[in-house]
Amino acid sequence: MFRRCAVKLNPYDVVVIGGGPGGYVASIKAAQLGMKTACVEKRGALGGTCLNVGCIPSKALLHATHVYHDAHANFARYGLMGGEGVTMDSAKMQQQKERAVKGLTGGVEYLFKKNKVTYYKGEGSFETAHSIRVNGLDGKQEMFETKKTIIATGSEPTELPFLPFDEKVVLSSTGALALPRVPKTMVVIGGGVIGLELGSVWARLGAKVTVVEFAPRCAPTLDEDVTNALVGALAKNEKMKFMTSTKVVGGTNNGDSVSLEVEGKNGKRETVTCEALLVSVGRRPFTGGLGLDKINVAKNERGFVKIGDHFETSIPDVYAIGDVVDKGPMLAHKAEDEGVACAEILAGKPGHVNYGVIPAVIYTMPEVASVGKSEEELKKEGVAYKVGKFPFNANSRAKAVSTEDGFVKVLVDKATDRILGVHIVCTTAGELIGEACLAMEYGASSEDVGRTCHAHPTMSEALKEACMALVAKTINF
């Protein structure tokens, strides 16, 4: 039973519902721009899926398991003997992951205090377009007025109707991050970012991992050259198995295992059994309990909140950003950019997000990073383009540290030389893609990048060389 609802009559300028990457950034920026701001988050910890059960914990496990796998597979060739004897303590690995998460969530809460953002721990919902009710985690209930509201409630994993998550053997990404032991066998349904990253984590630790993907290839939104290189590396280095053009038609949770019925493109069916099943078939917008129907906020047929060019919803003074909206990829950094831009717009300033220059990264080994158009997209759109490529086996730094897998691929407009897309496969692709984003944001040509001095020896020289290939010839290949 809740206590009587306390109503605060002094309205906030902005209330943000959701404290994930989009929500907490919007809250801080709004406060920095002089608006009285509150943020409502029901998780009890700021940072959303990304910080608590997504981007950050997965990167902690990816790093730890890479070091472990590298010790067993590669230390000897570096002249470091005994790597095969390195053992893994799963509990300590999980503890390190949790330390990273705790430190960062605490850091965001500190930033709220520093910027004078009022933080409500509880579930927020609309009473009216200008009244927000909070059911607090402490059992208290409050209601307050707001001039404007930003919906930033993010998304949640999509489950299979015949195999609901139990987070023991049928896992969402959350469960796959917290397994207490290494399963002997794991099947991953969905060969996208989450499936490939988390499948890789457990493959490195000894699980036999099979990825089942409905599309003809994994990560189908990425450039095909990139996908082929990544899948080849994962199959070779981590012994992952891939079943593409394959659909899941049924399955049974046996309590300690899962029996999965799959059908290939030839119509042949087979049963695959595994100790752990990771379901990563996408995410859906989280709007439950928000009261959007009460105030008639429009959503599309998939449940995403419809927004206009300035993040406005169908209801005046109600805005939305991040995974919950019907625009752009479902990525944390996209939500952050929207958070800044939306807050700026509410403060009467120009705010803008360039949806054509939002990078995507898969943090496997090697990593994959892309920004802009793929070659397949340019062909489909009928754009005349040129391709410049440079392999890392011709890069001095990659040679020196024995990380020669991969390449840089640059796509430019054939007439103007303007960069249209950059695709990278290498151990540090996620770090290198930033330069490509900056170049594209400012409308650079491949000649601009190719004639820019890069430090030697660095992996970044491969981007310079790929650009040089488009305007003259590469020097080192």
Curated annotation (Swiss-Prot):
Cofactors needed by this protein, per the record, are: FAD
Query: What reaction does this catalyse?
Result: N(6)-[(R)-dihydrolipoyl]-L-lysyl-[protein] + NAD(+) = N(6)-[(R)-lipoyl]-L-lysyl-[protein] + NADH + H(+)
Query: What's its EC?
Result: 1.8.1.4
InterPro entries in UniProt:
Class-I_Pyr_Nuc-Dis_Oxidored (IPR050151), FAD/NAD-bd_sf (IPR036188), FAD/NAD-binding_dom (IPR023753), FAD/NAD-linked_Rdtase_dimer_sf (IPR016156), Lipoamide_DH (IPR006258), Pyr_nuc-diS_OxRdtase (IPR001100), Pyr_nucl-diS_OxRdtase_dimer (IPR004099), Pyr_OxRdtase_I_AS (IPR012999)
Q: Between which residues do disulfide bridges form?
A: C50-C55
Q: Which residues bind NAD(+)?
A: G190, G191, G192, V193, I194, G195, L196, E197, E213, V248, G282
| Entry annotation: catalytic residues | H456
Gene Ontology annotations of biological process type:
2-oxoglutarate metabolic process
- Annotated residues that bind FAD are located at 41-50, 59, 124, 153-155, 323, 330-333
Cofactor, how bound (note): Binds 1 FAD per subunit.
Arranged from A to Z, the UniProt key words for this protein are: Disulfide bond, FAD, Flavoprotein, NAD, Oxidoreductase, Redox-active center
Its family?
Belongs to the class-I pyridine nucleotide-disulfide oxidoreductase family.
User: Further notes on this entry?
Assistant: The active site is a redox-active disulfide bond.
- PANTHER family annotated for this entry? DIHYDROLIPOYL DEHYDROGENASE, MITOCHONDRIAL (PTHR22912:SF151), DISULFIDE OXIDOREDUCTASE (PTHR22912)
This chain belongs to the protein called Dihydrolipoyl dehydrogenase
Organism of origin is Trypanosoma cruzi
Gene name in the database record? LPD
